[in-house]
From Swiss-Prot:
UniProt-recorded name of the protein: Islet amyloid polypeptide
Subcellular location: Secreted
GO annotation terms (biological process): amylin receptor signaling pathway
UniProt GO MF annotations: hormone activity; receptor ligand activity
GO CC, alphabetical: extracellular space
UniProt xrefs under InterPro entries: Calcitonin-like, Calcitonin/adrenomedullin, Calcitonin_peptide-like, IAPP
Gene3D superfamilies hit by this protein: 6.10.250.2190
Amino acid sequence: MCILKLPIVLLVLSVAVNHLQASPVESHQVEKRKCNTVTCATQRLANFLIHSSNNFGAIFSPPSVGS
């Protein structure tokens, strides 16, 4: 069952990364340079996924097994 969810997770991550690359860096602090490091990109991806968890809730919600 987990193997069937893998393509969906990869698709969501791909869309999220593309969105992060297309969107400007939003911060309350003035940034002197654009963030290009892997660590920063990972943090931005995590922030995006946290803030958009309501949109992806239906994808990651467990199925109803009922008995």
